[in-house]
Amino acid sequence: LAANKKVAFMAKQELFTDKNGLLRFLVKNLGAFAVNREKPEIATFKTVLELLKTDWSLGIFPEGKTSQSHILENVQKGFTLIAKKAKADVVPIGIKGFDGYAGKSLFKKHITITIGKPISYELPPEEILKQWAEQICEYTGYENRIGQEQEVSQ
């Protein structure tokens, strides 16, 4: 795993106008770009594919939010399709201790970040999702409620 690559993060567009000044500052200054989750645009996917052709990596938060319930469900599965189209392996990253940050100082919290094992983009999308969810739940302690019945369209 090459750690010397720059990372651009896909972030929901609401974060760029968030009332939390620290969060807004971080999103704008740590290489994030806005994504409309309700109406994803083709230009977004073109940007992602161009980005991955360079020396950048892409950070995606498929959950779309922090979870107060510690349950992994309703995951945006498009990351599996992006991985396949870009021929880029998926590296799960679990963040534990970040939930409940709103209105509180992050400097008083213990946050653990675990970098997982790469998942081959050559696997079927459903298998990429399954392996990603298993690793994320292992690293975060979340309960996996992503069912086998969930389909990933190709």
Model-based region annotation:
Residues 1-39:
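Catalytic core of membrane glycerolipid acyltransferases/transacylases, capturing the structured
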Residues 43-154:
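Non-catalytic C-terminal accessory region of glycerolipid acyltransferases
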